[in-house]
């Protein structure tokens, strides 16, 4: 079977489960053949080997079952950087780039700042910040050991030495003070489980869903973060688009000042910031 024939075949198979069947087919081919998509399109007359077809059809079946494309090719781009991912880590979303963007703004007047990333996953937030601010010391923590392993591999791949990763359940192993804490915690409620896209359910439950109608982890972070923040230090938390008022109320309850909420690139409330007095 030629490349162009497999692309047509795969695209038809993926129409029921993917919003971008043509792109998905090209990405899978690129991964198996270890060629860029431009090469694939330009050389679609080439015949695929038997081994190629075996590998492609295994991946195609998994994608037809709604498994995220990032888990199939083991990589996801975030902040224009490539990140290894696995089913033990949340897949980085474009919405989260607003958290990085705002963190960099609040760090602008600080040199050699110490930053903590709570629930680091594959390390996308910590490493994005580290790549932009080589003078800063970034620590990423996660309760899943495999996530720490993957985040550490990403740091090596990106050759970033100003970041380290620690296995910890929130603040349980943290004994440092920081100029900033950032977090993209789980913030979906358990009741939302039945409404999310099927492919989201392939991602780790612990990284998606939280108690207290999705606000349990956020409340915990806001309540206990002050112990680890210097005076005038900042806390930035990502949350759901309907959670702004509740999240702001937690910041006020625990005596933060200069509280503000920022919208993501889809104009939805996404990140709330507060400063320790």
Swiss-Prot record:
GO molecular function: nucleic acid binding; protein-(glutamine-N5) methyltransferase activity; protein-glutamine N-methyltransferase activity
EC numbers for this chain: 2.1.1.297
One GO BP: methylation
Gene3D superfamilies to which the protein is assigned, alphabetical: DNA helicase RuvA subunit, C-terminal domain, Vaccinia Virus protein VP39
Regions that span the bilayer: none
Binding-site residues, S-adenosyl-L-methionine: 119-123, 142, 170, 184
Keyword annotations of the record: Methyltransferase, S-adenosyl-L-methionine, Transferase
Highest taxon above the source species: Bacteria
Record-linked InterPro entries: DNA_methylase_N6_adenine_CS, HemK-like, Methyltranfer_dom, N5-glutamine_MTase, PrmC_N, RF_methyltr_PrmC, SAM-dependent_MTases_sf
Binding site for substrate: 184-187
UniProt xrefs under SUPFAM superfamilies: S-adenosyl-L-methionine-dependent methyltransferases
HAMAP family on file: RF_methyltr_PrmC
Similarity section: Belongs to the protein N5-glutamine methyltransferase family. PrmC subfamily.
Protein name: Release factor glutamine methyltransferase
Naturally occurring in which organism (per UniProt): Buchnera aphidicola subsp. Baizongia pistaciae (strain Bp)
């Amino acid at each position: 079977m030629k490349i162009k024939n497999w692309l047509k075949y795969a695209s038809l198979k993926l129409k029921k489960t993917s919003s971008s069947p043509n792109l998905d087919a090209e990405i899978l081919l690129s991964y198996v053949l270890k060629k860029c998509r431009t090469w694939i399109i330009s050389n679609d007359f080439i015949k695929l080997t038997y081994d190629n077809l075996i590998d492609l059809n295994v991946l195609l079946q998994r994608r037809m079952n709604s498994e995220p494309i990032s888990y199939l090719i083991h990589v996801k781009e975030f902040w224009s950087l490539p990140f290894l991912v696995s089913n033990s880590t949340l897949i980085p979303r474009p919405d989260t780039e607003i958290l990085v963007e705002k963190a960099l703004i609040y760090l602008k007047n600080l040199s050699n700042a110490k930053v903590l990333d709570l629930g680091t996953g594959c390390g996308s937030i910590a490493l994005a910040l580290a790549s932009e601010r080589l003078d800063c010391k970034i620590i990423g923590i996660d309760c899943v050991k495999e996530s720490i392993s993957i985040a550490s591999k990403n740091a090596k791949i990106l050759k970033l030495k100003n970041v380290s990763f620690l296995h910890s359940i929130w603040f349980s192993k943290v004994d440092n003070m920081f100029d900033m804490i950032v977090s993209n915690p789980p913030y979906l409620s358990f009741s939302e489980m039945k409404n999310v896209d099927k492919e989201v359910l392939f991602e780790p439950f612990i990284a998606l869903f939280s108690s207290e109608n999705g606000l349990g982890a956020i409340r915990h972070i806001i309540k206990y973060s002050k112990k680890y923040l210097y005076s005038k230090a900042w806390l930035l938390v990502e949350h759901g688009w309907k959670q702004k008022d509740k999240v702001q109320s937690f910041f006020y309850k625990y005596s933060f000042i200069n509280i503000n909420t920022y919208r993501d690139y889809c104009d939805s409330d996404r990140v709330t910031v507060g400063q320790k007095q």
